């Protein structure tokens, strides 16, 4: 019999949850009187922390700001989090898992939450396009190599 490698790769979602929600419409109801031609800004940020041996929390923060001219129509922020068991990977592979793979899992939940909040604010439907977290992570690695130590972040 051959000896099996004791460090098998394993990934499991333990829990996905909303950690924080904020919705503000600071210029309502006046903003509803204006023609709806907003400028929409999307801001993404990820963070991860180790909770236990091979157990990590990943938090995806999504902030959407819609402005009409100089006025803020709405500001919506969601922190979507997950607890993940990750075993058998280290270094760059682990960083990629926590910085790209897990946020890819969390984003649809955050997007649904934001869409619901905007709708409840009686604003027109907001459709957020999918995000390529793999490309964002590669940009982050490139920035790290160039000496810029910022966390994975995107303005769209």
UniProtKB/Swiss-Prot annotation:
GO terms for cellular component: cytoplasm. Signal peptide: none annotated. Transmembrane segments: none annotated. The keyword Transport applies. One of its GO terms (biological process) is protein folding. It holds the Pfam family SecB. Keywords: Chaperone, Cytoplasm, Protein transport, Translocation, Transport. The keyword Chaperone applies. InterPro entries: SecB, SecB-like_sf. CDD domains: Translocase_SecB. Its main location: cytoplasm. GO terms for molecular function: unfolded protein binding. It is found in: Cytoplasm. Belongs to the SecB family. One of the proteins required for the normal export of preproteins out of the cell cytoplasm. It is a molecular chaperone that binds to a subset of precursor proteins, maintaining them in a translocation-competent state. It specifically binds to its receptor SecA. Also required for the secretion of HasA via an ABC transporter system. Homotetramer, a dimer of dimers. One homotetramer interacts with 1 SecA dimer. This is Protein-export protein SecB. It comes from Serratia marcescens. The gene is secB.
């Amino acid at each position: 019999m051959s000896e099996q490698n004791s460090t098998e790769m394993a990934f499991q979602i333990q829990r996905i949850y909303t950690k924080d929600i904020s919705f503000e419409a600071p210029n309502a109801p006046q903003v509803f009187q204006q023609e709806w031609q907003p400028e929409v800004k999307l801001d993404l940020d990820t963070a991860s922390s180790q909770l236990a041996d091979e157990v990590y929390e990943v938090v995806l923060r999504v902030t959407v700001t819609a402005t009409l001219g100089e006025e803020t129509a709405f500001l919506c922020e969601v922190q979507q989090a997950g607890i993940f068991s990750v075993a058998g990977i280290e270094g760059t592979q682990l960083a990629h898992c926590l910085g790209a793979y897990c946020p890819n899992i969390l984003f649809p939940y955050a997007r649904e939450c934001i869409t619901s909040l905007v709708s409840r604010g009686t604003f027109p439907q907001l459709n957020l396009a999918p995000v390529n977290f793999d490309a964002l992570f590669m940009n982050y690695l490139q920035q790290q190599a160039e000496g810029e130590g910022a966390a994975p972040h995107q303005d769209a």
